[in-house]
């Protein structure tokens, strides 16, 4: 079965318009808007993974928050103790800023004003 060049060109000339005709009839223009609820399997899986990650980091977040609160309480207590030490009736009491304690000038021991 020998196909000559002229037969190939003739076949191509016949098939090309047919292919174009089919492609134009298959293509249809739609004006529909599809709105999804967002409740697809993929979005549910993503939400589950995010929740799992959030729960995994919960312990770390709690530790950071506790440490921050502890440091805040320590600074707040030191501020109150400094005020008490400076307003103390004891003339030998002084505030030591490095150790955040009220000390006796003579002995160096901690004083509770």
Swiss-Prot record:
The keyword Signal applies. It comes from the Bacteria. The keyword Signal applies. Disulfide bonds: none annotated. Keywords: Signal. Residues 1-28 form the signal peptide. Belongs to the UPF0482 family. This is UPF0482 protein YnfB. It comes from Escherichia coli O1:K1 / APEC.
């Amino acid at each position: 079965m020998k196909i000559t060049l002229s037969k190939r060109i003739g076949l191509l000339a016949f098939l090309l318009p047919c292919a174009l005709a089919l492609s134009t009839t298959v293509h249809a223009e739609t004006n529909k808007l599809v709105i999804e609820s967002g409740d697809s399997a993929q979005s549910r899986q993503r939400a589950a993974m995010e929740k799992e990650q959030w729960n995994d980091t919960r312990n770390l977040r709690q530790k950071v928050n506790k440490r921050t609160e502890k440091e805040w309480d320590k600074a707040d207590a030191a501020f109150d103790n400094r005020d008490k030490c400076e307003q103390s009736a004891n003339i030998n009491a002084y505030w030591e800023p490095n150790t955040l304690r009220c000390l006796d000038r003579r002995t160096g021991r901690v004083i509770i004003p």
